[in-house]
Structure formats: C-alpha cells, structure tokens
C-alpha cells in the first residue's frame, strides 16, 4: 500500500476515515468533494467535477459519497474507462453512484481493472446478475461497516449529533 495513490470520492466522515487508514500504510490520498476545495484529512483535495480528467492518476478509487440527484451515476463509463491500468474500484457507499450497466461493460472489456463492491443499485444482488461471472469483481453483502470498534464510533457520532442538536435548541 505504501506509495500508492488513492482517490476517495466523497470527503465526508466515511471518506476521511478511509483516507486515515490508507495514510497509516503510506498511501497518498486525494479527497474529491462537490462542496469544498479545502484539505480535511487528505493529502490533497479536488472538486468532484474534475474526477474524470484525473482518475487515471490513481491506483485505487474508493467511493464514499452520498447518493444525491447530482451524484447519481457519478462513476460513469467515461470515468471507468479513464482509470489507469490495474486500478481498483471500491464502492462502500451507494450502488446508484456507479452506472451499473457501464461498470459491467467496462469490467468485461478491461480485465486489468478490479472492482470490490459492497453496494448495488438493487440489493441483494440477484443470482443471475452478470457481475457474479466476472473474475475481476469481488462482491460482499452490504456489510463493509462491520469492523472492530465500529459500534463505539457510531455511538460517539450519535452522541455528538445529539449534543449539537440540544445546544442549538437552547
């Protein structure tokens, strides 16, 4: 992992946690966000609208963005085709962020790419879905959030959110 370049598409809390873990192993991280150009927990920041032009610079692309009308299909055929040789795409956010048909077609054409997918447009992934047949795809059943210490982190976030809500109501 040391020395690789990682694009994290979605620079919110989840994206920052992903970046922190990659940075711990010596990776260089770039956060892509639609709202800001400020570095927050990343080595670099970029606007999401520039993703297609610079996605070819990254060894790994991790999708952590929220699904909004403006982000639906964000990872398009053009973005996928622009990924560098032997790149890895990871989606732990929402299936609708990736154009599912385009992803299947590109992964069928480009055996050098690899996708690790925890989420899909329609879940669970049906037994006849063609993604199951691709050797360059790993599928998990929407459980990437399961990890040691996750409950503690979730309760800390809930506590902080409740505290903020109460303080704003005073």
How does the language model describe each region?
Residues 1-17:
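Glycine-rich NAD(P)-binding loop of Rossmann-like domains
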Residues 5, 27-28:
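Residues at the starts of beta-strands that form the adenosine-phosphate
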Residues 19, 23, 107-108:
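Gly/Ala-rich phosphate-binding loop of Rossmann-like dinucleotide-binding domains
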Residues 25, 41, 133-135:
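Short, structured coil segments at secondary-structure junctions
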Residues 33:
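Conserved acidic E/D residue at the C-terminus of a beta-strand in Rossmann-like folds
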Residues 36-130:
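Rossmann-like adenosine-cofactor binding region
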Residues 123-170:
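C-terminal helix-to-coil terminal segments
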């Amino acid at each position: 992992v040391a020395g690789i370049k990682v694009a994290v598409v979605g620079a919110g809390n989840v994206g920052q946690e992903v970046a922190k873990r990659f940075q711990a192993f010596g990776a260089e991280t770039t956060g892509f966000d639609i709202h800001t150009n400020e570095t927050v927990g990343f080595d670099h920041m970029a606007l999401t609208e520039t993703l297609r032009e610079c996605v070819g610079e990254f060894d790994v692309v991790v999708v952590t963005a929220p699904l909004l009308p403006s982000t639906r299909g964000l990872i398009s055929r053009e973005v996928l085709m622009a990924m560098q040789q032997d790149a890895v795409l990871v989606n732990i956010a929402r299936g609708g962020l990736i154009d599912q048909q385009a992803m299947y077609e590109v992964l069928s054409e480009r055996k050098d790419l690899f996708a690790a997918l925890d989420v899909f447009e329609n879940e669970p992934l049906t037994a006849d879905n063609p993604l199951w047949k691709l050797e360059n795809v790993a599928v998990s059943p929407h459980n990437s959030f399961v990890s040691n210490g996750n409950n503690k982190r979730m309760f800390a976030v809930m506590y902080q959110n409740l505290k903020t809500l109460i303080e704003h109501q005073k």
